[in-house]
Amino acid sequence: MAKTPTRSRKRVKKQVADGMAHVHASFNNTIITITDRQGNALAWATAGGSGFRGSRKSTPFAAQVAAERAGEMAKEYGLKNLEVFVNGPGPGRESSIRALNAVGYKITNITDVTPIPHNGCRPPKKRRV
């Protein structure tokens, strides 16, 4: 019995003028997510997913490449302006913002949303190398 071919509709990409870029910069990796104003993800990229492994993953250059990839993927939605939210202490904080600017987005606002404890949990012990 032959299957009747089901017609698949091509998804229409919605056009968004303003968006938000969430940069999560940890010590080991950098994750960039570009969302619309409601927080729905449009594109994302990581330093590890951009071809960097091990200690090279935690470099500013890896964060720059990841931000460029996420920025190019989000171009399909017609984004022009970005509001950047930076979270974490990692080395890719500044380079990812510069890369998003170089892709062609107008950055309207940069906000640091790193959670700062009011003397909460005990931090990890200092490394002895």
UniProtKB/Swiss-Prot annotation:
A molecular function GO annotation: structural constituent of ribosome
GO cellular component, one term: ribonucleoprotein complex
InterPro entries named among the record's database cross-references: Ribosomal_uS11, Ribosomal_uS11_bac-type, Ribosomal_uS11_CS, Ribosomal_uS11_sf
Protein's GO biological process: translation
Signal peptide start-end: none
Keyword list, A-Z: Ribonucleoprotein, Ribosomal protein, RNA-binding, rRNA-binding
Assembly and binders: Part of the 30S ribosomal subunit. Interacts with proteins S7 and S18. Binds to IF-3.
Entry-linked HAMAP family: Ribosomal_uS11 (MF_01310)
Function statement: Located on the platform of the 30S subunit, it bridges several disparate RNA helices of the 16S rRNA. Forms part of the Shine-Dalgarno cleft in the 70S ribosome.
Family, per entry: Belongs to the universal ribosomal protein uS11 family.
Protein name: Small ribosomal subunit protein uS11
Organism from which the protein derives: Idiomarina loihiensis (strain ATCC BAA-735 / DSM 15497 / L2-TR)
Phylogenetic lineage: Bacteria, Pseudomonadati, Pseudomonadota, Gammaproteobacteria, Alteromonadales
Protein encoded by which gene: rpsK
